[in-house]
């Protein structure tokens, strides 16, 4: 069985080092190829995105071109390292990663976490608080408009429907906070629909 680590699936040196360490730990081969090479198990780091075909764009995003080539041509198992969902810091370097089989998203990947013991979660020191049903406001937090986690959902439409539902079911103030990459896009949606002074 040939396990092949595609080191150029990420342009970041610290992530390439992670892949090298993983390769050493399982005695896998590492390739520096910029295109797919046949193997039984392909290992990549990061999500893949469809990219615009301009030459300049392709050069900047060659790691996405490689990952698309792997996803399109590989017929065996695909192991995907991706940024963590839990205990994530605002940094490019992480203490842990999620690892999915054949994909990186819930519902599409097998994370082999069914019936997992709580020791890994508990080791992160996350304090899970009870759902708060009282307070002065409800906070609605936006996501990057083009993030894969949205599965194609129109975030602006989701926001409008969520605000309408909240206005019908609570008297609390509704505060919308956008994702930093969106600048003030969701705020513009809120302002465009001229909601009551309960929404900001």
Segments from the language model and where they lie:
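N-terminal pre-catalytic "stem/leader" segment of glycosyltransferase-like enzymes
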Residues: 1-51, 146-147, 156, 170, ...
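Charged active-site motifs of nucleotide-sugar-dependent glycosyltransferases
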Residues: 3, 135-139, 173
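Well-ordered, non-membrane alpha-helical segments in soluble/globular domains
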Residues: 16-23, 56-68, 154-165
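Short, well-ordered secondary-structure micro-motifs within conserved domains or adaptor modules
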Residues: 33-66, 71-72, 77-79
């Amino acid at each position: 069985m040939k396990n092949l680590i595609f080191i150029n699936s990420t342009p970041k040196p610290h992530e390439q080092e992670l892949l090298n360490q993983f390769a050493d730990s399982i005695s896998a081969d590492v390739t520096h190829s910029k295109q797919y090479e046949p193997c039984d198990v392909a290992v990549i780091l990061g999500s893949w995105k469809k990219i615009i075909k301009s030459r300049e764009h392709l050069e900047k995003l060659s790691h996405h071109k490689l990952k698309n080539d792997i996803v399109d041509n590989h017929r065996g198992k695909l192991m995907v390292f991706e940024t963590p969902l839990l205990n994530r810091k605002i940094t490019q370097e992480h203490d842990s990663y999620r690892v999915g089989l054949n994909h990186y998203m819930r519902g599409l990947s097998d994370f082999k976490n069914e019936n997992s013991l709580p020791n890994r979660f508990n080791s992160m020191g996350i304090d899970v608080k009870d759902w708060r049903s009282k307070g002065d406001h409800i906070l609605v937090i936006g996501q990057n408009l083009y993030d894969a986690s949205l599965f194609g959902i129109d975030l602006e439409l989701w926001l409008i429907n969520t605000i309408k539902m909240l206005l019908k079911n609570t008297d609390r103030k509704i505060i919308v906070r956008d994702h930093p990459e969106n600048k003030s896009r969701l705020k513009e949606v809120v302002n465009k629909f001229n909601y009551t002074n309960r929404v900001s």
